[in-house]
Amino acid sequence: MHPRFENAFRQLPASLQAALRPLIDKPDFAAMLTADDVNAVCEASQLDADALAFALLPLAAACAQAPISNFQVGAIAQGLSGNFYFGANMEFSAVQLQQTVHAEQSAVSHAWMRNERGLRAVTVNYTPCGHCRQFMNELRDAASLRIQLPGRQPATLSHYLPDSFGPVDLQIDTLLMDDINHGATLQNMNALARQALDAANRSHAPYSKAISGIVLETSSGNTYTGRYAENAAFNPSLPPLQTALNLMNLAGEDLSTVKHAVVVERRNAVVSHWAISQIMLAELGCTDVEHHFIEE
C-alpha cells in the first residue's frame, strides 16, 4: 500500500478494509476501481455504490498535493461503465495559483484519460466551487450528473449551477469526454512524440481549435499523457500538462521524477501551452522538453 493511504485506510470499517486491501495493496494501484472491483467491494462490505463512493473519499483526499493551502479535497467520479476514479486537488509552488487542479477536475480528467465515455455522479467531500461547477458543465452528461456531498441529498449539477452558461450557448456540440480524433499528423515521430500526438488528437478544444497534448517520461521509465480540456468559460480549462501530472500523481509517482517531456501543438495557434509547460516542468526539475508542431 502506498504510504499516503495508510492513515485514511486505518479509519475505514474492518469489512471495507478487508475488501479493499487486495486492491489497494497492488504495486500498480492507480487510484481507480473497475466496475467488477466496485461490485465485489460493495458485496463484501454491504455498501451500495453511492455509500462506497462516500467511504472512499478519505483515500482520494490522501492523494492531494496541497503545499500552499494544506487543504485536502477528494472526489470520486462514477463512470457510466461502473468504474470509480479518484481525484484530488493539486497545487504547484512557485507558479500562479491558476495552475491548480481542483479535485473535481482531477476526478473527471482521470476518468477521461482512462477513456471513460460519461459520468453518472461525482462525490466530493466539500461543496464544489464555482470553477468546478463550470468545468463539469462541459460534460455530455452535465444535465443528469449527480453531485453527492456528505450530509446532503444528491442533486443534479444544474441545482448547483442554475441558469448556466455552457457549450450550447456557443453552438458547440462536441463535448468533454466525447470520442473524438482530430486526425492531425507529425513527421519524423519518435515513440514519445506519437503518444503526445495521440493526446493532442483527442483534446477537447472546440473554442480555440488549439489542440495540444503532452507526454511525461519518468526516471522509472513510466509515461503519462495529457490532453487539453477546454471550457466554454475559458478560465476553468485544464491544460495538458496538468492532465498528465494528475495521472502521474494518482498513480503514486513523485512529480519530481519527470526526466523528459514532449509537447505537441499547432503552430501559430491562438493558445499555446509551451511556455507555461516549460516553466512548470522546470520547477519540478525537468528541463529536457521537446516541442513539436502538428502538420497542417
Swiss-Prot record:
Active site: E104 (proton donor)
Single Gene Ontology BP annotation: cytidine deamination
UniProt keyword terms in alphabetical order: Hydrolase, Metal-binding, Zinc
Record GO terms (molecular function): cytidine deaminase activity; identical protein binding; zinc ion binding
Record's keyword annotation contains Zinc: yes
GO CC term (a single one): cytosol
The record's free-text note on cofactor binding: Binds 1 zinc ion.
Top EC group: hydrolase
Record: residues binding Zn(2+): H102, C129, C132
Keyword Chloroplast: no
Assembly with partners or alone: Homodimer.
UniProt similarity note: Belongs to the cytidine and deoxycytidylate deaminase family.
UniProt-recorded name of the protein: Cytidine deaminase
Classification lineage: Bacteria, Pseudomonadati, Pseudomonadota, Gammaproteobacteria, Enterobacterales
